[in-house]
Every structure is written in C-alpha cells, then in structure tokens.
Amino acid sequence: MSSNSSCLVTNQGGALPLTATCLEGFYCPNNSLENPPEICPPTPQCRLTRLQEYHNICDHAQGTYEPIVCQPGFYCPSGGKRQIPCPKGHFCPLGTVEPFKCFGLSSCAEGSEREIPLAGLLCSILLDIFLVIVVSWPFPFAWIRQLSRGKLRRGAGGNDSESGVISAGRREISFSESKYHVSQFFTSDGSHGTAAGIEVEFSGISMRPTRSGIETLCLQNGVIRAGSFVGVMGPSGSGKSTLVKVLTGRAQPTTGSVLINGDTCRAAELRDLLALVPQDDIILPDLTVQENILYSSRVRIGSSRKDSEIEQYVDHLIISLGLNKVRNRLIGEVGKRGLSGGERKRVNIALELAAVPGIIVLDEPTSGLDAMTALSVIELLKSLTKQGVIVICVIHQPRLEIFAALDDLLLLNHGRQVYFGSAAAAKQCFQDAGYTFPLNSNPTDTMMDIMSCHDNLHLTDYPRNKPALPKQNLRIVLQSVKKIRAPWYCQVLLAFMRGTKQQTRQYPSFVLEILTGAGCGILIGLSNYEFKGHLFQGLFHLPFQLLSSPVSYRLLTEQGMLLCLTIGCAAGPAGVKTFGEEKLVFLRESCSGYSEGAYFLGKALSTLIRIFLSALHFTSFYLILTTPIVSFPNQLIVNLLYFYCIYGAASMISAITSPKNGPLITMLTSVLFCALSGCAPRLASVKSWNLAWLWYICPAVWIAEANFNQYTDPLAYLYDIKPAAEDAIRAWDRLSLHSLFIV
C-alpha cells in the first residue's frame, strides 16, 4: 500500500469514494465523517474469489476505508463499528445485524453461521416410537384375552363353534335363536326400513344398449307382493343380471318403468329402498368381519336405534350366518390370508342385511357355499319374508330344499320372460305344455335344459298365492327410509374412524411412505449441503452495489422446483392408494345410499395423519442438511401444504384411472407441476407468451414463491430484493396469500 492511498491495490485507478455512511449488515471500523466509506480495486486473490459462482465474498476489506459485509458467524450492530462473535443459541449468516434466535432444540454453538434444527428430528423419533407402540401393543393383550376366553369355554364345557357365542355375563346364544332375533329386528311398522305393504311392479321393461343395439331384456308386466321370496333363474346370458340392475336402480331401462306401490320410482329412489348383494364380494380387506358389518349398520340405521342395539343385532346376524368363528378376522385379499370364498360371500350378504332393508335383491348368494351353508342362508332369508320383506334371489340350478323355499319363480331366456308365477306350480306348468320330467330328478335342472333347447318358449303365468297387503304412500316410505340413516356429520365421523383404523392395519405401506419422505428430504438436503445455508445472494443496497459479488437468483428458484419434485415423489404414489384401492367399495356404498361427501371428507381427514408424518420426516432431514435461514415451523407449513396438494391431485387421478395406471399418471402430473413452477422457463418469459394464467393455476408456482419469500424477507435489509423478484417475476411481498392458493 502506498503512503497516499488507503487501498491494497494502487495501480488500478485508486479508491472510489462513497457519500453514505456504513449501511446495515456491513463492518466499517475505520469510517467516519472525515473518512467516509470508499471502494477499492480488488486484489488478484479477491478478484478470483468474486468470480466464483458460490462462496464469492472476500474475507478482508480491500482498503482501510472500504466497508466489508459482516462475516458469517459474527454480527455487526447498526453503525458497523464492531464485529461481534455470534452468541450461543443464535446463528449469524452473512451480513447479520442482530443475531437470529435459534428454534428450540436446535444446535447453535457460539460463532454459528447457520442453525441445525433438531426439533423436527426429535419429534419424528418420538412419534415413530409412539406409533410402533400403538401398532404392536394390542398383540400381547389380544393373545392373553384369547387364551382366557379359551379357558373359560373349556371350563364351561362348551366349544368355539359357529353355533353360539359366549360373552361376559351372558349365556350361549344358539344359531336358531340368533336367526329368530334377526327376523324380529325386521319390524313390520316400517320404522327400520322394512315398510310392510311395499309392492314392486315392473311394466314393459326392456333394455337395448345403444352400442350393440341388441335387446338384452324384454319383460311383460309383473308384480311382486310384500313378503314374497322370488327366485330368478335362466341360462347364462338370459338377462338375470340386467334385471337386477334395473330393479335396483343401477341401470335405466330403455322402455318401461319400475313402480313401487303403484308410483313410478326413479333410479335414485330405488337405490334408497332396495338393498343389493352383488355377485362380486366387494368388501374392505383391512377391516374385520364385525367391523365391516357394524359400519354398514351404523350408517344405514344409525338414527333409529341405539348403538348398543345395533351391536346386539350385528352379533345375532354374525351368528345366524355362521361367521362367529371369524368375526375378528380380517377380510383379506388376493395373496393375503383372510377369509375363505364362502365366508366372504356370507359377509357380503351380512353387509346388506345390516341395513334392515324392506326389499333385498341377491345376485347368486349361494355360489361358493357348501350345501348346508347355502340352505341355512336361504332359511334365514325365508324367515325375513314373514316380516314383510321382499327377497329377490338370482339362483343357478338350486337344490330341491332351496327351490322349495321359493314362493315365486321368474324364468328368463334370452332376455324374455318364460314363466312368472308360483314356484310350486312351475313343474306342472311345463308338464301342461307337453314337457316331461324324469323321475327323482331336480325339476330346476330339467327346466334349464328345456329353456336351453327352446329359445322362444313362453308359458302361461300361474297366479301367486301371496295376498296383497295395504300399501303405504311411496313418499312416506322414502321419508322413513332416509330418516333412519345416520346424520351426515355422523357418517363423516364413522368414515374418519374407519379410515384411521385402516391406517393402523396398513403399517408396511405406512412405514414405506414415511421412509420415502425421509429419503427424499435427505436427497434434496445433500444437494444443498455445500452451500451452508447460503442459498440466496443479491445486490447490496445503494450506494454499496459495487461491492456486490455475482448474484445467485436462480439457485432459489431451482430450490423451489426441487422441493416440488421430491415432494411429488414422496406423496404421489401414496396418495393414489387413498381412494384408488377403494373405488369399487365407494361405488357400492354410494349406490346403497351412503353420503358420498361424508365418505370423501372422513377419508381425507383420516389421511391427514399420514400427510403430516410424511411432511415432518421430509422437512426434518431437509432442514438438517440444508440449514437455511427459514425457521422449522414455517418450512414445515409450506411443505405440508404441498404434500396435501399432491395427495389431493393423486386422489382425483385415482378416481378416474385404473389402479395400474394411477401411480404413473400421478408421477407425470407431479413432474408437470415442477415444470410449471416458474424456474425454467422463467415466469418473465411465460408472461411474454401470455400464458402466465396456466402457470398460476399450478400449485408449484405458489410453493416456489412462498419458498422465495421465506428466504429473502429476512435479508431485505442487506440485499435489494426487488431486482431478484423482477428477474423471476415473483411476488415477494404476499407470503400470506401463497399458503391460501396452495390449498
């Protein structure tokens, strides 16, 4: 340094004097009114440092009177006369005026330039331990209870059979007694959905799909009276399933109509009145037999009976269907041990009987059942008809005992009505038409053979023996049925409790989801580790702009895009499972009168626990490695909101795509969101294309802007933030709006 210059380098034009005093965030120990701040040419070593993309701030001033930004690990109070080491419990990044207080449980030693937040990691560990205890704790106690129950039964001289159940303080309940209690629960006053006096009439029903143009169903007029047990038979492709869909409101006939008590009934009203047991066993696999049946009963008759009465009824229903031994067993699914095919069929029937319907339609309820079990199911259904319930049963060549239980018989062939009348008179009707039946043969087998050989067969209908009962007004019946259902808010609570219980049973996928969130947080954190929390560098405020090193605006926008990408990877596939695996269950429940809104809200609320835990693990590891200036709560809120967005998008995708394609489409959607985050192409370019509206309907833009604000707001005293915001066309002063738009 020469005697007449204060700069380290004197051969490049000397100092450029400044007219301002020391700005906040700078260290100016030698400046005064007589010696104002000045800018000196950099030394070769400092010049090389300033040419670096990152870590480009020189450690020392280039002259006696040149200000230097306050170094990391120190803070410089207003005036810039002192550079003080950062105290313990605080951290001081580049240009600190007042030390930033560390969040609770963070690692901040004396002289820290960044905060290492450990609160999230500690919360994650504690919550993980708690969840492990919750999931594993019931098992030893369940084993003890099972052992005690076994000793009690052996001591009482009983056994664990399907014919009875033992509970504390109660005697053994027999199969026949349970069947009696079930039939008595179907009261004849209509207050529980039975609505005695209901009469079903179909008039000129036909179905001709527009695509094929082939008539699949063509019926003459028919009436089904209250208390009738009607069997529907016919060869494959005869229109039995089509008839079931029309009668239950699942399909709209091309011509004709279905009448209830003489009034035309719309499809939605039919779904309210009738209970359908589909041929496929559509049941939630992660719940037990009792839990599935109880849920159905609580939703559909929750307003008419006390919960204790519903539980007692479900107990009797389980025993009467021979499910007592498996009442606490999970339903299971393909490749996962659960119930047998016959047991699943009986649970399928119990789900609809739990609603105490006035009309129940069953599509092949005896398929997959052994002879004795099939007969017991038919006997239970027969007992319900004595309470005025209409039972319509699609059966395929039943045994003699089952055929004898039928009151009426409807025979279909190629969609046309062959016979509709008394089941007992059907054989005689065929014989009167000139057909013979072999001795000691099952008449249903012979009838099926005859229809298979004669496509245009039509027999005279024989009158039914069931007398007409006094009819109730259809509107009164509909009101009584809707009145007994659980209120909407109760259905939300029930759906939430069911969804939460499912989460506890899906712990392998639950653990994988949390580990994925933690892994994604580690990956993005490692990509930022070398920056030591210094993710943004802008131009210093005037007149110190010439002291600025190259700016790094793009790093922060890239950070927002990476956040969107990694959160999409962590939350997308998991979000598909929320609704995608239950689509068929939802459709069945929706057609049975369950509130669709209550289901979606309750299910969504039950997933908030998973969303929070995934976001917590992601944020904890991300912040430990990235160590940004952003506080742990603020970063957690932003990440949590984007997790919620991805879950919502994945849920909508799963509702309109197949389970096979859902995860792939969700990942592609997440990548699309990242592309529309405003990083590349920049929002400045997008605005020139007049396509900014497309970017702003994407949640990734809003999380990127929220991330931008969280990093730049605390440094606004040091850097001129406006040029950085204009470079990316970011709204740097509306953080509160970002959270709203993300949601």
UniProtKB/Swiss-Prot annotation:
GO CC annotation: membrane
Intracellular or extracellular location(s): Membrane
Glycosylation sites: N4, N30, N159
UniProtKB keywords: ATP-binding, Glycoprotein, Membrane, Nucleotide-binding, Transmembrane, Transmembrane helix, Transport
Binding site for ATP: G234, P235, S236, G237, S238, G239, K240, S241
Membrane-crossing segments per the record: 124-144, 507-527, 560-580, 611-631, 636-656, 661-681
UniProt similarity note: Belongs to the ABC transporter superfamily. ABCG family.
Task of the protein: ABC-type transporter; part of the cla gene cluster that produces clavatol and ortho-quinone methide. The clavatol biosynthesis cluster cla and the terrestric acid cluster tra are both involved in the production of peniphenones and penilactones.
Name used for this protein in its record: ABC-type transporter claG
Organism: Penicillium crustosum
Lineage: Eukaryota, Fungi, Dikarya, Ascomycota, Pezizomycotina
